[in-house]
């Protein structure tokens, strides 16, 4: 398939503003805070203090967590396990979720909390409310130095807490809750040690390990019963957020969908933190060398194109755009609009700038209530029909890549309406010459071009 794009100085402002706009828009499916490698944490910063007030005798530590929907499963699951192991009366966790508050606002009153853990969360008036709570004695810990500078301690200046949060995983999040209890001198609670969790790799639900690269993965996968050497290979590229938040059941659905369609999947997870370039070279070749096509819910960020550009050129396969929305599946299916306007930039525009094609909504965030804690959280839920459709499209692209150029059939469509400003010629495009150049290039690549342009 051929696509002609054109532009000029009138579009230059869009390219300059796009990186800024992407940072300001909500970003479904990924997180700005990333997992840190397992290493000895640095000593605490001199400005890193502890709790401002002592816990009331006989009362639990009251913790408010300010967050977004994608992080709620691990926070709730870990709290459930904490209560199971330590009982009630040690810690109370109250989640303030950006998307949930937007639908059902509640007064921003935080003075009753002993500690506020400020993660990524944007609620109007939140900063002022947190600052007021700090003046009343609440201990505010923020994962970013871009917010709450006047009242918060930076999480990374508290290595005993950061070691748990930055590495994620259910065990580490339980450990974070335990370490908070230690900070408030809760009797009977001793924090477990943090355990390293991979922040990049290849996942399969039937494997006992996360693979570092495709070479080791395919060596394992090809030894499985029923492996078809001639089946198409489909790469699935995702952010690491869901893996770090223990939502691997969603990964399993993605993998099984490809396997049920008769293809061989390889799912790789990874993430580039906003404003950083940590992590070295792009993992695309390491994960997906030899695949026929890639399905990706990555590339929401403009800086990712620069990071992956060389690897994409070397990989030289179609990359289909998978979209995860921060809305419930039923809400999306009942909407006449489909994709909300504030999702277009990071879900459609930015991925297309990176070369992704065929955007398809494949998942939403489903509100669920934990029966043990009574807390609401948001699971990533696959939209089955749409995902099956995208898998079929991916396999069609794989088949096309395996078809000789002379046997492919291509239609070139162009818009040309009346004369004047509406006409393509008024945009200073020489349509005839462009088509001739395209057809000549196709012929040079082995396509069978018949006839001539009149």
Predicted features along the sequence, with ranges:
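Residue-identity detector for glycine
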Residues: 7-8, 29, 49-50
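An N-terminal assembly and electron-transfer interface module characteristic of large anaerobic redox
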Residues: 20, 32-454
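N-terminal secretory signal peptides that target proteins for export/translocation
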Residues: 1-12
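Bacterial N-terminal signal peptides
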Residues: 16-26
């Amino acid at each position: 398939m051929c696509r002609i794009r054109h532009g000029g100085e009138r579009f230059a402002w869009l390219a300059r503003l796009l990186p800024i706009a992407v940072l300001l828009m909500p970003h479904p499916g990924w997180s700005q805070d990333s997992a840190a490698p397992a290493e000895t944490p640095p000593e605490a910063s001199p400005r890193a203090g502890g709790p401002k007030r002592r816990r009331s005798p006989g009362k639990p530590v009251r913790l408010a967590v300010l967050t977004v929907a994608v992080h709620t499963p691990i926070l709730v699951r870990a709290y459930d396990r904490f209560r199971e192991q330590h009982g009630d009366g040690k810690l109370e966790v109250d989640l303030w979720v950006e998307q949930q508050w937007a639908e059902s606002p509640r007064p921003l009153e935080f003075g009753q909390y002993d500690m506020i853990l400020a993660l990524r969360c944007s609620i109007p008036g939140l900063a002022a409310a947190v600052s007021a709570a700090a003046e009343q004695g609440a201990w505010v810990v923020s994962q970013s130095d871009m917010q709450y500078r006047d009242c918060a301690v930076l999480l990374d200046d508290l290595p005993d807490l950061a070691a748990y949060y930055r590495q994620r995983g259910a065990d580490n999040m339980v450990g974070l809750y335990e370490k908070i209890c230690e900070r408030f001198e809760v009797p009977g609670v001793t924090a477990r040690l943090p355990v390293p969790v991979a922040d990049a790799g290849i996942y399969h639900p039937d494997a006992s390990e996360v693979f570092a690269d495709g070479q080791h993965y395919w060596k394992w996968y090809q030894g499985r019963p029923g492996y078809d050497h001639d089946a198409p290979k489909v790469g699935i590229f995702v952010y690491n957020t869901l893996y770090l938040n223990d939502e691997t059941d969603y990964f399993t659905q993605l993998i099984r969908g490809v396997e049920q369609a008769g293809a061989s999947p390889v799912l790789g997870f990874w993430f580039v933190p906003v404003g950083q370039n940590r992590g070295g070279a792009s993992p695309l070749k390491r994960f997906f060398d030899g695949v026929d096509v890639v399905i990706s819910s990555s590339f929401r960020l403009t800086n990712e194109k620069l990071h992956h550009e060389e690897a994409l050129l070397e990989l030289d396969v179609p990359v289909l755009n998978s979209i995860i929305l921060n809305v419930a599946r039923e809400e999306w299916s009942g909407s006449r609009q489909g994709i909300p306007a504030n999702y277009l930039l990071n879900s459609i525009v930015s991925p297309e700038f990176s070369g992704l094609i065929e955007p398809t909504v494949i998942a939403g965030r489903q509100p669920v209530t934990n029966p043990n804690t009574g807390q609401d959280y948001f699971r990533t839920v696959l939209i089955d029909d749409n995902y099956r459709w995208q898998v079929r499209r991916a396999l069609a692209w794989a088949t096309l890549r395996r078809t000789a150029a002379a046997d492919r059939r291509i239609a070139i469509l162009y818009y040309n309406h009346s004369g004047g400003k509406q006409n393509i010629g008024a945009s200073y495009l020489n349509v005839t010459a462009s088509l001739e150049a395209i057809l000549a290039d196709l012929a040079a690549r082995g396509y069978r071009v018949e006839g001539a342009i009149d």
